[in-house]
C-alpha cells in the first residue's frame, strides 16, 4: 500500500430539493495536495477579493450534471453572477455557461462544455466513505479527507441557505413588493396585452359579425366602431384571397412571401387601425402620406409576425417536450419526482425574460424598408378597394343610396421656394364623414405600447429590455445607422450606468387620480372650453359677402382660410385629448402601472408610451400620481404648499419659499372650495397656470389639513423641483461664469433670480438709450420709441430659453414678431417686421453681455464641429455616463420603389454629412447630453436612498416628504458632474480621433466656485 498522498478532485451533484447530495464522482488529479483545505479556507473567507463563491453566487454553479443525468437535456443550474471558471481551483475548467439568476430554470439546457482531459465522470459511489475507501490506501488520509469533505458539505449547506435568502430578496425586488403570486398574475396579463391586442380586436369584430349575420342582431355600436365593422369583413376576405394566391405560388409580387405570414383577420385590423391612427395624429389631419402609412403598417405587420411566429414555435416545442416526457418512463421514481418539480419550476418562471427570449430565438431576418413599404402599400390598396361609407338615411326613398369610398388616393404637389421647382407625393385622404368621426376613434383604437402592469425588463443591451414581447430599443435612432452601430458596439459595462438609470425610471409605479379624471370627463362631456381644454365644436365659417367687390371677397377668403386652419388645429387637439383620455380610462382601475424608458441619441430619457405620460401636458400630469403613498411629515406638508403655489404661478412662483407658503395659506378657503366643488363652486383652481395639477394638490392638501394629524396624512402627489433656465445653468457651470451663475440661481439669494426679467431689464435700458438718438442718423430710434412700452419678460422669454439651442437672429426675430402680433400693438406688417428685427438684435446683444462665458463656449463647440464636419465626419462624443453619441445629420438621398399602389420615394442617409447642421446643432445637443447625465445620476442616487423618482429633463419629481433629500442629492450630483474636466476630455477625444486636425484652444473659464451650488436654495425649486 502506498502512502503517497494523492489529491482528490470531487464533483458533488447537489439535489436542490433534499438535504443530501445524490452521489459523489471522484477522479485523481495532479494539483495541490492541500486542495480541500484551500477550498474550505476560501469558502469561509469574508474578503470579497478572496471569495471563491460570493454570497451572490450559487454554491453549486460549477457542479454540472453527469453524462447519464436525467436532466441533461432539460435543466442547468446557473450562476446568479457570471464568473470565470479559470478562478476555480477544484480541478474543473469551463464546465458550462453561466447565466443570470433571474433566468434560472427558465429554458432548456444550453450545451455544457466539458474538457474531458480535466474532468471524467467515471464512477459514482453511494457515500463519501465508500468513495474515499476505494480511492485511498492510507487510513489517516481516509479520515482526513472524510472530515474535510464533511466540513465542505456543511459550508455548502450554509451557503445554500444564504442563496435561498438572497433569491427571496431578489424576487421581492423584482416584484416591486407586490407578492410573487400577484406579480405572476399581472405578468400574464401583461403578456396578453402585448401579444394578443390585435388578435382580440379581430376576435371582437368576428363576434360582432356573427351577432349581425347569424343571430340577425344589429349591434348598437359607436359610430367609428360601426365603420370598422363594416370595413373588416370585405378587407379580411380580400386579404385572404391574396394570401391564397401567394401561398400557391401564383403571385409573383415582391410582397408575396410576406403577406401570408399572419392570419388575414389580424392583418385587416392592423391596416384599419394604423391608417386611422395616422389620419388622427398626422400633421395634416384627415390625410396621410402614402409612404409614411405604408411603412407604419408594414412595420406593425412585421412586429406581429415575429410575435405570432414565436408563439407558434413555443407551442410546438411544448408539444415535443410533452411527448419526450411520456417516453421517459424508464427513469426511477425518485428521478421522475424530481423532474416534475423542475418542470413545474420551469413553467412558473418561463416568462422571466420573455422579451429577450423572443429576440434570441427568432432567427428570421428583418424585412427591410422596401419589403415593409410594399406590404403596407398592398394592404392600403386593398382597403381602398373595400372600404365604403354611406351618409345617414335622410334621402328620399326613390333616390339611389349615396355609397362612396371611405378613402381616396391622390397626388399632392407642393411648390418649393423657387417657382420652377416643386415636389409631388401621394396621400390618402378620408371622406368627410370619416373625418368627423376621427375624434371619437381614440377610445376604440388598439394602442399596442400601453403602460406596463409589471416593472419593465431590465436593460442589458441595445434591444434587450423594456417590454416583454413588443420590440424595445434602448435608443431612438430614427434610422441613423452609425448611431445604432455605436450603441451596439459599446460594452455592457460601459452602458451599465445608463441601463441602471433607465431601469430606475421604469421602476417608478404610477396610478390614475380618479377624482381629477372624473372632473376632466365632466368638462369634456360638456364641450370643453375650460382649464385649457379645446372647444369640442368647430368655429363657424364666415358668411360669404353678397358683393362683387374683389377686395371684400379677398378679405373673406382669407378669413375662411384662417378659420379652417383654426378648426384643423382644434381637431388635432381634440384627437390628442381623446387618445390621452382613452389610455387614462383603460388604466384607471389598475392598482398601478409602469413606464419603460429609453433615450434619444443625446441621452435624454423618455417614456416609451406616447400618449399619457408625465412628460405630457397639464391634463396628463393632473391625472398621474405615484401609486405608492407616503406620510407627508412636517417637511412634506410645507413642500406641498410650495408646490401648489408653483403650479398656480402667475408670478407667485418667483416669490421666496416662505412667500409661496404664505400665498397658499392665505387661499385655504379657495383650496377647500376647489377640492369640494371643483365645477359648482368658485372655481379658483381654474385660474392656475396648470389647472388640473393644481386641482390634484388642492384635493390632497384639503384632506391633509382637515385630518386630525396633517403630518401623518398620506400623499401620492409628485412634487416638482425645476431648474432655472437649466441650459444656461449648465453653460454657467462649464464656464465657471460668476455673472451667469448668479443670473440662473447657482448661488444663494433671498429670492429666486429671474433670468428673463434680467434680460428684459437690460433690453429696456438699451432701447431707452436708442430712443434718445436722432432718427436721421439712427433709423432704429423710431422702432425703439415704439417698443419701449412693449418690453417685458414675456417678450424675451422664448428667445432666452432657446438661446441654449443656438437660436439664430432669424429665429429670434420670428419669436418676437409672434409676441408683438399677439398684442396687436403694431398694425402695419412692414413696421411689425422692422420692429421685430430691431428687438431681436437688442435681445441677442443683452444675452451676450449677461452670458459671455456661455457664448464663448457655444462658439468653441460650433467651431470644433465645423472642423470635424468639413472632413465629412459626423461629430461624435461620449457622455459622462458612457453613452456614445453620433450626430445624425446627413444629406438625405432618395430611393424609389415600385409598389402596387404607386411609386414610393423612400428617404435614406447618404455618406455626405450636413456641415452647417452639424455645427449649429452640436452646442445644444452637447448641453442636452449633460442635462440628461445629471438627471440619470440623480435618479440612481435617489433610488439608492429609497426615494421614488421621476424626471422630465430639468424637472425632478418625488414625494413631498422626500423633497429635501432630493434637493441635496441633485445638487451633489450637479457638482460631481462638473468637477470632472468635461471640456478637456471632449477636446482630448477630438484630438485623439482626428490627430491631423487643429482645434481651437479651450475658452477661458471664470472663478465661480461650484460648491456654492450646494447652498443655493433656488438652484432647483
From Swiss-Prot:
Catalytic reaction annotation: RNA(n) + a ribonucleoside 5'-triphosphate = RNA(n+1) + diphosphate
Primary place of residence?
plastid
Q: What is its EC number?
A: 2.7.7.6
Please list the residues that make up the active site: 722, 797, 954
GO BP: mitochondrial transcription
Q: Which Pfam families match?
A: RNA_pol, RPOL_N
Cross-referenced InterPro entries, in alphabetical order?
A: DNA-dir_RNA_pol_helix_hairp_sf, DNA-dir_Rpol_C_phage-type, DNA-dir_Rpol_phage-type, DNA/RNA_pol_sf, RNA_POL_N_sf, RPOL_N
The segment annotated Disordered runs over 315-337
Q: Which UniProt keywords apply?
A: Chloroplast, DNA-directed RNA polymerase, Mitochondrion, Nucleotidyltransferase, Plastid, Transcription, Transferase, Transit peptide
EC class name:
transferase
Q: Which PROSITE patterns match?
A: RNA_POL_PHAGE_1, RNA_POL_PHAGE_2
Q: Where in the cell is it found?
A: Plastid, Chloroplast; Mitochondrion
Q: Which SMART domains match?
A: RPOL_N
Q: Which GO terms describe its molecular function?
A: DNA binding; DNA-directed RNA polymerase activity
Q: Name one GO cellular component term.
A: mitochondrial DNA-directed RNA polymerase complex
Q: Which Gene3D superfamilies match?
A: 1.10.287.260, 1.10.287.280, 5' to 3' exonuclease, C-terminal subdomain, DNA-directed RNA polymerase, N-terminal domain
Q: Which family does it belong to?
A: Belongs to the phage and mitochondrial RNA polymerase family.
What does the protein in this record do? DNA-dependent RNA polymerase catalyzes the transcription of DNA into RNA using the four ribonucleoside triphosphates as substrates.
The UniProt entry, under PANTHER family, shows: DNA-DIRECTED RNA POLYMERASE, MITOCHONDRIAL
- What is this protein called in UniProt? DNA-directed RNA polymerase 2B, chloroplastic/mitochondrial
